[in-house]
Design a protein with these regions (language model features):
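Active-site-proximal alpha-helical scaffold in enzymes
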Residues: 1-28, 59-93, 133-139, 248-268
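Condensing-enzyme catalytic core mediating Claisen C-C bond formation in acyl metabolism
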Residues: 48, 81-82, 113-178, 227-239, ...
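Conserved catalytic cysteine-centered active-site region
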Residues: 1-25, 29-61, 99-125, 152-157, ...
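Stable alpha-helical structural segments in soluble proteins, enriched in small hydrophobic residues
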Residues: 2, 6, 10, 14, ...
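Phosphate/pyrophosphate-binding loops at sites that engage ATP/ADP/AMP, CoA/4′-phosphopantetheine
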Residues: 69-74, 176-189, 268
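Short glycine/threonine-rich loop-to-helix capping motif typified by GTGT followed
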Residues: 163-167, 197-221, 232, 248-250
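Short acidic, glycine/serine/threonine-rich loops at helix termini
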Residues: 33-38, 92-96, 163, 204-207, ...
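Beta-strand segments within the central parallel beta-sheet cores of soluble alpha/beta enzyme folds
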Residues: 22-27, 78-85, 146-156, 187-196, ...
Length: 282
C-alpha cells in the first residue's frame, strides 16, 4: 500500500536513464471475499498468533497497540477524536470523499465499538478507487509545459525495530535525520502533512517519528494545534485521509501522495493550503 515505494522506483528509473517518463498508477477495490483473504494473511504475526485463534483482521491488533499507547503516554480518545474530526472537516471540500457529513465529538465518542478502544470512526471505510501521477526529469516537465512538484527527499524502510515487543515507533524514526538533511529543510518548514491513516494511533506515531514532537507527545501536539486546512496551523491529511475519503485497498497509500502533488501544483480538488511550498507524505 506504499505510494512512496513506487515514487522512489520511478525516480530512480528516470535518474538512471532507464525511462524518460514513468506513470505510477494505483487502483484497487474491496470485496468481502478478497478482504477475508487479506485479513487471513495480514502479516506473519497474524498468521501465527492471531488469525488461527479467531481474531482475524487488523482491527484487533491495532486495538492492542492503541490501548498500549494510551496507557503509556496518557493519550485520550478525545485526542484521537480531534484528529478524526479535523480530517472530516477537510474531507467536506473533497469531492471524492465517502464521508459527506461533519463529524462531531459526541458522534465520535458515542460511535459503536469495533475492538476496544477502537470505535467506528477510528477505522477506515473500504472502497474502490485509484490514483495516478507521472514522474519525469524537471527539464522534461518544463518542455511539456506541465506543472510539477520537485522531490527533495525520500526514505524507505521495511521491518524496522523487529525486537520491539510492542511497535510504538516505525521505520520513519530510523531515517528521519538523513531524510531532512537530504531535503535541506526541517520539520518546521513543512506546510502540510499527509500521513498514512489506517488508524489514528498510527498518525500519532508518525507525527512523533517524523520529528514534529518527541515520542509520546503527539496527543499534546494535537491538543495545541489546529489540524484543519481552513484555519489550521498544522494541516494534516488535507483531502480527509483514508479515515474520511475511504481506503481503496492497496491504492490507499497513494492518496496522500497525489494530494500532496495537487497542493503543490495548484491542482486542488478540495481545500487549499494557501502559499504551501513544502509537503510531506508518508
Amino acid at each position: 500500500a506504499s505510494g512512496g515505494v513506487g515514487l522512489r522506483r520511478a525516480a530512480r528509473a528516470v535518474q538512471c536513464g532507464d525511462a524518460e517518463i514513468v506513470a505510477c498508477i494505483a487502483g484497487d477495490t474491496n470485496h468481502v471475499g478478497s478482504f477475508r483473504n487479506t485479513i487471513a494473511s495480514f502479516s506473519q504475526f497474524a498468521n501465527d498468533a492471531v488469525y488461527p485463534y479467531g481474531s482475524g483482521g487488523p482491527n484487533g491488533s491495532f486495538a492492542f497497540l492503541t490501548d498500549h499507547y494510551m496507557r503509556e503516554f496518557g493519550a485520550r480518545r478525545e485526542d484521537f477524536a480531534k484528529l478524526c474530526i479535523a480530517q472530516r472537516d477537510n474531507a467536506l471540500a473533497f469531492p471524492h470523499a465517502l464521508m459527506k457529513r461533519p463529524l462531531t465529538l459526541d458522534a465520535y465518542m458515542d460511535a459503536r465499538p469495533i475492538a476496544d478502544p477502537l470505535c467506528l470512526f477510528d477505522c477506515v471505510m473500504p472502497c474502490a478507487g485509484a490514483e495516478a501521477y507521472l514522474v519525469m526529469a524537471e527539464d522534461r516537465a518544463k518542455s511539456l509545459n506541465l506543472d510539477y512538484a520537485r522531490i527533495l527527499s525520500t526514505i524507505e524502510r521495511h521491518n524496522a525495530y523487529p525486537d520491539d515487543p510492542i511497535q510504538i515507533r516505525g521505520g520513519w524514526a530510523m531515517d528521519v535525520d538523513g531524510f531532512y538533511d537530504l531535503a535541506g529543510i526541517g520539520p518546521e518548514d513543512i506546510d502540510f502533512l499527509q500521513v498514512y491513516d489506517d488508524y489514528p494511533v498510527i498518525c500519532f506515531m508518525q507525527i512523533e517519528d517524523l520529528g514534529f514532537c518527541k515520542k509520546g507527545e503527539a496527543a499534546e501536539f494535537v491538543r495545541t494545534h489546529d489540524l484543519t486546512v481552513a484555519g489550521g496551523d498544522f494541516p494534516i491529511n488535507t483531502s480527509g485521509g483514508q479515515l474520511s475519503v475511504g481506503q481503496a485497498g492497496a491504492a490507499g497509500g497513494s492518496l496522500g501522495l497525489v494530494e500532496t502533488i495537487r497542493q503543490l501544483t495548484d491542482a486542488n480538488l478540495g481545500a487549499v493550503v494557501q502559499g504551501a511550498r513544502h509537503g510531506l507524505a508518508s
